[in-house]
């Protein structure tokens, strides 16, 4: 593929934008090479500035659950724009959004809109500390909750991709207030709570890890956290920025039947526009200013254009059997990829929850961060580029989940699998040639 225009833009971008991108994973540092620059998107496709089309399984990192540029969302945005871009004052759409979230996710008795997932998690942690009078928070290896200082402690996603345990600029004193546990380890959680449960303000967790690829909870694990938190007066925060309205209409908490005290949202609730939210029990949310003393504010929070896009999206995903079709499409993709890898003699495991999935180049099921990092990342990188050359775009990191949309029809899935069969066989052939070249010559 000729990517001359993308290359020129990337060179230019690096003179004005750190690393040439506005979020690290976009730079392709993990997989090698240079990123392509997008000109437009429609349905299941991205189109780059060099005229290439890609079947997209990144979906803007999750929010495009009905496909790119859906006419229902686009028209809602056009109507909202005709009435103004930002008010700095309350509008009816933000009330409707709060009511909609509360109806679909009953644990959210009250909701506060913000501008990003990071802003939502930072606000939820401040609320938890203020409401409990405690300072310690607990997170899990491989979980990513945005770029807030309290979370950049053995973080996943971009941090994992860059291979850094933390970030310069995060005070050591603050890091000491974040305790990191192994996800899916029952005994580790129990031991920590027995030792210092009464000092912990909150446990924050991705109920399905999507930032160390796609790792679901072991049976009963989320309920175990719920039980411990209740016993010790600790707030349980589900970070559903990724899983919210993605794995089920009511999010992961509905799928697994576990009720958190607070929930953070992003991505899908903005319909592709910048947005975030956090919500939870009424008695907790009443601590937020101006109802209470815990401060949080935002000039663009509840932006009318973002609210219009999000409400249109939330309306579309309530269609009958929407999630059944979404899950079936993801299952067909994962089953087909698994079969294609197996036929080529390549060890790969797929894991899928609803409309999100993960590809692990290993022959084992992956339940922990350590297992995810032990997978064959070099082989993933080869697969990524082989698929990209064939017009299929997966996340440019072995540690990011993939996403499917309602626009990914059976024909799109089959086109993906056809490309994958060729890609896997090419990788297998390359490995065989390399193996032969490395075989020592026997001297007689």
From Swiss-Prot:
GO cellular component: cytoplasm
Catalytic activity annotation: (S)-4-amino-5-oxopentanoate = 5-aminolevulinate
InterPro entries to which the protein is assigned, alphabetical: 4pyrrol_synth_GluAld_NH2Trfase, Aminotrans_3, Aminotrans_3_PPA_site, PyrdxlP-dep_Trfase, PyrdxlP-dep_Trfase_major, PyrdxlP-dep_Trfase_small
Keywords per UniProt: Cytoplasm, Isomerase, Porphyrin biosynthesis, Pyridoxal phosphate
CDD domains: OAT_like
Catalytic EC class: isomerase
Record-level Gene Ontology MF annotations: glutamate-1-semialdehyde 2,1-aminomutase activity; pyridoxal phosphate binding; transaminase activity
Main localisation: cytoplasm
Domain of life: Bacteria
PTM sites of type N6-(pyridoxal phosphate)lysine: 267
Any one Gene Ontology BP term: protoporphyrinogen IX biosynthetic process
Matches recorded under Pfam families: Aminotran_3
E.C. code: 5.4.3.8
Pathway: Porphyrin-containing compound metabolism; protoporphyrin-IX biosynthesis; 5-aminolevulinate from L-glutamyl-tRNA(Glu): step 2/2
Localisation: Cytoplasm
Listed cofactors: pyridoxal 5'-phosphate
NCBIfam families (UniProt xref): hemL, PRK00062.1
Recorded family membership: Belongs to the class-III pyridoxal-phosphate-dependent aminotransferase family. HemL subfamily.
Subunit structure: Homodimer.
Protein name as annotated: Glutamate-1-semialdehyde 2,1-aminomutase
Species per Swiss-Prot/TrEMBL record: Xylella fastidiosa (strain M12)
UniProt gene name: hemL
């Amino acid at each position: 593929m000729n990517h001359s225009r993308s290359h020129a833009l990337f060179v230019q971008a690096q003179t004005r934008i750190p690393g040439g991108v506005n979020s690290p994973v976009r730079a392709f540092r993990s997989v090698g090479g240079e990123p392509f620059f997008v000109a437009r998107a429609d349905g299941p496709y991205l189109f780059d500035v060099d005229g290439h089309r890609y079947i997209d399984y990144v979906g803007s990192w999750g929010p495009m659950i009905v496909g790119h540029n859906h006419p229902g969302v686009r028209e809602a945005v056009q109507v909202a724009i005709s009435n103004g871009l930002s008010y700095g004052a309350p509008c009816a759409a933000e009330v409707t959004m709060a009511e909609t979230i509360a109806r679909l996710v009953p644990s959210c008795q009250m909701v506060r809109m913000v501008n990003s997932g990071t802003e939502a998690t930072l606000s939820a942690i401040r609320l938890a500390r203020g409401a409990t009078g405690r300072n310690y928070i607990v997170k899990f290896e491989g979980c990513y909750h945005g770029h807030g200082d309290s979370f950049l402690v053995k973080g996943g996603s971009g941090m994992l991709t860059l291979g850094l345990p933390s970030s310069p600029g995060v005070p050591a004193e603050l890091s000491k207030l974040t305790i990191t546990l192994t996800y899916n380890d029952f005994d580790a959680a129990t031991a920590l709570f027995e030792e210092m449960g009464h000092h912990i303000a909150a446990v924050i967790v991705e109920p399905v890890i999507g930032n160390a690829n796609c790792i679901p909870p072991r049976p009963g694990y989320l309920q175990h956290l719920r039980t411990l938190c209740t016993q010790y007066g600790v707030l349980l925060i589900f970070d559903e920025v990724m899983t919210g309205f993605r794995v089920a209409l009511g999010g992961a908490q509905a799928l697994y039947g576990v009720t958190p005290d607070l929930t953070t949202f992003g991505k899908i609730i903005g319909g592709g526009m910048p947005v975030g939210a956090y919500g939870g029990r009424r008695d907790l949310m009443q601590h937020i200013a101006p109802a209470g003393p815990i401060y949080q504010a935002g000039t663009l929070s509840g932006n009318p254009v973002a609210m219009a896009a999000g409400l249109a999206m939330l309306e579309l995903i309530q269609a009958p059997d929407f999630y059944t079709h979404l899950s079936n499409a993801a299952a067909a993709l994962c089953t087909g990829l698994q079969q294609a890898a197996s036929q080529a003699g390549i060890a790969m495991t797929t894991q899928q929850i609803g409309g999100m999935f993960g590809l692990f180049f290993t022959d084992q099921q992956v339940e922990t961060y350590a297992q995810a990092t032990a997978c064959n990342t070099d082989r993933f990188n080869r697969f990524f580029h082989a698929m990209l050359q064939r017009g299929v775009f997966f996340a440019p990191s072995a540690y990011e989940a993939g996403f499917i949309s309602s626009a990914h029809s059976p024909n799109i899935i089959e086109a993906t699998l056809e490309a994958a069969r060729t890609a896997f066989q090419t990788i297998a052939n390359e490995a065989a040639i390399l193996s032969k070249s490395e075989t020592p010559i026997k001297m007689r």
